[in-house]
Amino acid sequence: MNIAVFGTGQMGHAIVYMLRQLGNYTIYTCDNRAADSNLMTDYHSVCDVKDMEHDYLQKFDLVISSLPYYLNNELAQKCIEHKIPYCDLGGSVPVSKTINQSAKSLKSTVFTDLGLAPGWANIMAEQALLELPSVPHTVKMRCGGLPSDIAPSNKDPFNYKLTWSIDGLY
C-alpha cells in the first residue's frame, strides 16, 4: 500500500513512525522543505500543494495531511477528485465541513479532524485494545500538554508542552 504523508513537522514525523510500526507500507512524504535524516520515509518530495501536478496523487492508496489547516482543503479536494481516501489532523471546523460536504457529493472517503486528541490518541488506544490479551470494558483517556510539576519557569512561564499547530488559534 502506498501512503503519502503531507507535512513533515512533528506530527508528520509521528505519523510516519507509527506507519512503520503498524505495517509494511511504502511511505511517501511531501513537504515544502527537504526531509531531515530522522524521517523514516521511502520517498520524499519537496512540493507545494498549490502547485502540485494534476496526476501526482494517483500513485497513492491513502493520503494523510499533517499540513497546517489552511492547506487541507486544497489537498483534500484533489484527493476527492481522484477518489483517493484522505484524512487530516483538522484545525478548522469550517474547513472540515467544506471537505466533508465535497466528499459526500462525490462519494469519496475522507476522515477529517484526526488530530492528536481526539483523533490519533483514540486510534492508538483502539490498536492497544486489539493487541491486549483480555479486553477491558473501558478506556480512560486524557489529553493535554500540562506537566505534573506546574511550577512555571522563566523560559516558559506557562509551563505548557505545545503538541499541535497554533496556526489559526486566536
Model-identified regions with their sequence ranges:
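Rossmann-like dinucleotide-binding core of oxidoreductases
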Residues: 109-170
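Rossmann-fold NAD(P)-binding glycine/threonine-rich loop
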Residues: 89-112
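A short helix->loop->beta-strand "cap" motif at the edges of active sites that frequently abuts
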Residues: 24, 82-85, 106-108
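Beta-loop-alpha module in the N-terminal Rossmann-like domain of NAD(P)-dependent dehydrogenases
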Residues: 62-79, 92-96
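Conserved N-terminal Rossmann-fold NAD(P)-binding element of oxidoreductases
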Residues: 3-7
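Rossmann-fold cofactor-recognition segment
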Residues: 41-51
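NAD(P)-binding Rossmann-fold cofactor-contacting core
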Residues: 25-40
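Hydrophobic/small residue at the entry helix of a nucleotide-binding pocket
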Residues: 11
